[in-house]
């Protein structure tokens, strides 16, 4: 009788370990899937950028440095070895793209260019998707990391060498409150 109880306890423990292990694997896979959604949007943006660069190229020689920086950052995003590196390059690229859009305000012909307007809309939509995907990734990564730290799954995670997922943080430049100057009387007059 005690032999059957011992076997039953061992079976319950093994089933519990399998259940927790599978739960951790699912959470890790969801984190990887969430990252792949970001990666898809980064690739989409990288595919749109050559068209934007070609469209903007003829509208000002002093912006050439900005276009070269965009090309360089685009390559960094594509060749990043980790999600954190990809997002660091991506954040810098986002700032450069915003700079291109700001400079375009000085060129009425460019602002009226239908191809430019389409690209601007596509890139804006893609940036919004990247932002949403980052939020989703951080949420899923947070859930996964909680499972890694909560008892008893932390014991199983340690036994099978599960590693926590990195969060994607917002760069300090983007957290800063923008300075707005409407002139001396506050109305731009």
From Swiss-Prot:
It is a single-pass membrane protein. The keyword Transmembrane helix applies. Induction: Expression is maximal during the early to mid-log stage of growth and decreases after. Does not respond to heat shock up to 43 degrees Celsius. Part of the lemA-htpX operon. This is Protein LemA. It comes from the Bacteria. Keywords: Cell membrane, Coiled coil, Membrane, Transmembrane, Transmembrane helix. SUPFAM superfamilies: LemA-like. GO terms for cellular component: plasma membrane. InterPro entries: LemA-like_dom_sf (IPR023353), MamQ_LemA (IPR007156). Disruption phenotype: No effect on extracellular glucosyltransferase activity, nor on growth characteristics. The lineage of its organism: Bacteria, Bacillati, Bacillota, Bacilli, Lactobacillales. Belongs to the LemA family. Gene3D superfamilies: LemA-like domain. The chain crosses the membrane at residues 1-21. It comes from Streptococcus gordonii (strain Challis / ATCC 35105 / BCRC 15272 / CH1 / DL1 / V288). Residues 110-138 form a coiled coil. It is found in: Cell membrane.
């Amino acid at each position: 009788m005690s032999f059957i109880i011992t076997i039953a306890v061992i079976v319950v423990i093994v089933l519990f370990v399998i259940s927790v292990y599978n739960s951790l694997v699912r959470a890790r896979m969801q984190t990887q899937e969430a990252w792949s959604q970001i990666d898809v949007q980064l690739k989409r943006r990288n595919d749109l950028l050559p068209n934007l660069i070609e469209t903007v190229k003829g509208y000002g020689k002093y912006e050439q440095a900005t276009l070269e920086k965009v090309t360089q950052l685009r390559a960094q995003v594509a060749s990043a070895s980790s999600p954190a590196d990809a997002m660091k390059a991506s954040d810098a690229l986002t700032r450069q793209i915003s700079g291109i859009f700001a400079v375009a305000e000085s060129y009425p012909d460019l602002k009226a260019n239908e191809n430019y307007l389409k690209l601007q809309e596509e890139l804006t939509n893609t940036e919004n998707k990247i932002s949403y995907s980052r939020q989703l990734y951080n949420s899923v990564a947070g859930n996964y990391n909680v499972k890694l730290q909560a008892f008893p799954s932390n014991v199983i995670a340690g036994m099978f060498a599960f590693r926590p997922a990195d969060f994607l943080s917002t760069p300090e430049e983007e957290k800063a409150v923008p300075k707005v100057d409407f002139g001396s009387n506050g109305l731009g007059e």
